[in-house]
Amino acid sequence: MIFVDTSFWAALGNAGDARHGTAKRLWASKPPVVMTSNHVLGETWTLLNRRCGHRAAVAAAAIRLSTVVRVEHVTADLEEQAWEWLVRHDEREYSFVDATSFAVMRKKGIQNAYAFDGDFSAAGFVEVRPE
């Protein structure tokens, strides 16, 4: 299983993004099912709506209905784990959404992510790149 971060969804949904081609190649070679979270989808909506407009955000929101994307809902317990993790890690400016993603990944035993911002690697996960 691969976890998908906002940085990947934003690159995939924005043809003007410098990593759009890389995102398309990764998506073409993805496993049968990937995972993301409701927090990541919310962040993706905001990012694409601001950068690319409403139509791009609506297209990205359709991800939640896809049969190849499993959306994990972040529980109060996972949010608390994220807050506790953030308090312990001041070596980088991690976002709360990333910290909730890390909590989901630890809960599900996921090590690999489609992510482009370096935060997942810095947190000990593997940011997958095309071969």
Curated annotation (Swiss-Prot):
<dbReference type="GO" id="GO:0000287">
    <property type="term" value="F:magnesium ion binding"/>
</dbReference>
<comment type="similarity">
    <text>Belongs to the PINc/VapC protein family.</text>
</comment>
<dbReference type="InterPro" id="IPR039018">
    <property type="entry name" value="VapC20-like"/>
</dbReference>
<feature type="binding site">
    <location>
        <position position="5"/>
    </location>
    <ligand>
        <name>Mg(2+)</name>
    </ligand>
</feature>
<keyword id="KW-0378">Hydrolase</keyword>
<feature type="domain" description="PINc">
    <location>
        <begin position="2"/>
        <end position="130"/>
    </location>
</feature>
<protein>
    <recommendedName>
        <fullName>23S rRNA-specific endonuclease VapC20</fullName>
        <ecNumber>3.1.-.-</ecNumber>
    </recommendedName>
</protein>
<dbReference type="GO" id="GO:0016075">
    <property type="term" value="P:rRNA catabolic process"/>
</dbReference>
<dbReference type="GO" id="GO:0004521">
    <property type="term" value="F:RNA endonuclease activity"/>
</dbReference>
<feature type="binding site">
    <location>
        <position position="98"/>
    </location>
    <ligand>
        <name>Mg(2+)</name>
    </ligand>
</feature>
<dbReference type="GO" id="GO:0044003">
    <property type="term" value="P:symbiont-mediated perturbation of host process"/>
</dbReference>
<comment type="function">
    <text>Toxic component of a type II toxin-antitoxin (TA) system. An endoribonuclease that cleaves both E.coli and M.smegmatis 23S rRNA between G2661 and A2662 in the sarcin-ricin loop (SRL, E.coli 23S rRNA numbering). The SRL sequence is highly conserved and is implicated in GTP hydrolysis by EF-Tu and EF-G. Acts on purified ribosomes but not on isolated RNA in E.coli, nor on a shortened artificial substrate. Upon expression in E.coli inhibits cell growth, colony formation and translation.</text>
</comment>
<keyword id="KW-0540">Nuclease</keyword>
<keyword id="KW-0255">Endonuclease</keyword>
<dbReference type="InterPro" id="IPR022907">
    <property type="entry name" value="VapC_family"/>
</dbReference>
<keyword id="KW-0460">Magnesium</keyword>
<dbReference type="InterPro" id="IPR002716">
    <property type="entry name" value="PIN_dom"/>
</dbReference>
<keyword id="KW-0479">Metal-binding</keyword>
<dbReference type="Pfam" id="PF01850">
    <property type="entry name" value="PIN"/>
</dbReference>
<keyword id="KW-1277">Toxin-antitoxin system</keyword>
<dbReference type="InterPro" id="IPR029060">
    <property type="entry name" value="PIN-like_dom_sf"/>
</dbReference>
